[in-house]
């Protein structure tokens, strides 16, 4: 009893010291939309008006340390100023006396030596929110003031981003000055509604023979790009950017998610050399925008940089009606970064240590990549497979979203055949007679059949030699070797290295050329005449040139 009386007196004393509790916040209407949906719907309008300012003005110095700031929006709490309560690595807890920000709202730390953006991830109760930092938190201290911007992370979009490199929060990192534009969009947006999406299946002609013939890309589809180091992945990506710009007038966006800084720098330099990116007065003629979040960045930045790149691509699709190419390198790092964020937030891990929201995180990104009635976003995603285990949850979840796979083979690159696309391992949902037509489908299957038969005969050739093969098998091998070399192609972006002019091959020409090889029309031509050319007319011309040189 004495203990109970002592506790009661302590509680009463604490209540007197604490004073009257603050008045409860007024309740809104009963049928208020969900916070995330409300935030998505109004973010674009708010961003256009408010996000053009680099940062909202800080609260007056005379205000209280734990509050202050003029609230300009009752729902989002825009303008409210809170206080940092706890910093644990990339996780920062912030308390707001009023103007509590909704989930996914961007906060900006005031009076900091660099611009530090935090994104609200959890509401902890007692006016406390848990946030993920988009940059390093070195130098951040308890009590520092934090501004509620009232909108998600908002980035510049439009033609001003072409030829520029920016980070996850839209800041330029190429030392070429500010990105001057009036167009801004939040990175968190809803996927296009069903009524806005185009259901017609069309192929995106790339001008690359091996891709268009054997594993065609769907307009608005998602393509997985598999390949190790040094097999020509970067050159293939740059040629796709170049060809889409020339043939379709479209732009490209490259999102570097959690990859090496050196590779990002090399890609930028190679794009400048090949003319994909132009500097100085001709910058407006650039064909690609770059968004980087390298592997040295905090997990919050790596988890959101893919969304930043996608937002830039969405503007080109929706506002300008473009066919946009979106490159994501590497989509596995996006999943990996979200797994780190999930662990930092204290969520219980799922299979193989991945976040329990793995499918939701990936689906939120992939479902925004689609074709609408205005334009399309076709995504090429480099995919790292951990320990070459295709059943790992990260790549396995990614495969469910892909429409085509392009596999780059080291064995083919060792033969000097570029692009080193494996014609047997690469697949596409578009390889159907209902989509491509009977001629294209039959030609593609015929090419694959000849190459597969050649692959089956290689062991016999290695042991016994060509002389032991039947006449039919010798003919199969001869045609397969010609097809293998005919799948090579000089690229425009490689002209500066090879000296050979690049070739863009129309789809119809590719189909007719390979059908002629299958029918035996060109059995008399030497196989070296099929190497590094465009259409079949060039093969004939090259064969005549070789014959003249041999005769002389």
UniProtKB/Swiss-Prot annotation:
Transit peptide: 1-46
GO MF, one annotated term: ATP hydrolysis activity
Subcellular localization: Mitochondrion; Mitochondrion inner membrane
GO cellular component, one term: proton-transporting ATP synthase complex
Record CDD domains: ATP-synt_F1_beta_C, ATP-synt_F1_beta_N, F1-ATPase_beta_CD
Keyword Translocase found: yes
Annotated residues for binding of ATP: 227-234
InterPro entries: AAA+_ATPase (IPR003593), ATP-synt_VA_C (IPR055190), ATP_synt_F1_beta_sf (IPR042079), ATP_synth_F1_beta_su (IPR020971), ATP_synth_F1_bsu (IPR005722), ATPase_a/bsu_AS (IPR020003), ATPase_alpha/beta_chains (IPR050053), ATPase_F1/V1/A1_a/bsu_N (IPR004100)
GO biological process, one term: proton motive force-driven ATP synthesis
Catalytic activity, reaction form: ATP + H2O + 4 H(+)(in) = ADP + phosphate + 5 H(+)(out)
Region (Disordered): 15-35
Keyword Translocase: yes
Keywords: ATP synthesis, ATP-binding, CF(1), Hydrogen ion transport, Ion transport, Membrane, Mitochondrion, Mitochondrion inner membrane, Nucleotide-binding, Transit peptide, Translocase, Transport
Entry's EC annotation: 7.1.2.2
Function: Mitochondrial membrane ATP synthase (F(1)F(0) ATP synthase or Complex V) produces ATP from ADP in the presence of a proton gradient across the membrane which is generated by electron transport complexes of the respiratory chain. F-type ATPases consist of two structural domains, F(1) - containing the extramembraneous catalytic core, and F(0) - containing the membrane proton channel, linked together by a central stalk and a peripheral stalk. During catalysis, ATP synthesis in the catalytic domain of F(1) is coupled via a rotary mechanism of the central stalk subunits to proton translocation.
Assembly, per entry: F-type ATPases have 2 components, CF(1) - the catalytic core - and CF(0) - the membrane proton channel. CF(1) has five subunits: alpha(3), beta(3), gamma(1), delta(1), epsilon(1). CF(0) has three main subunits: a, b and c.
PANTHER family reported for this sequence: ATP SYNTHASE, ATP SYNTHASE SUBUNIT BETA, MITOCHONDRIAL
Family the entry assigns: Belongs to the ATPase alpha/beta chains family.
Listed NCBIfam families: atpD
UniProt protein name: ATP synthase subunit beta, mitochondrial
Natural source organism: Oryza sativa subsp. japonica (Rice)
Organism phylogeny: Eukaryota, Viridiplantae, Streptophyta, Embryophyta, Tracheophyta
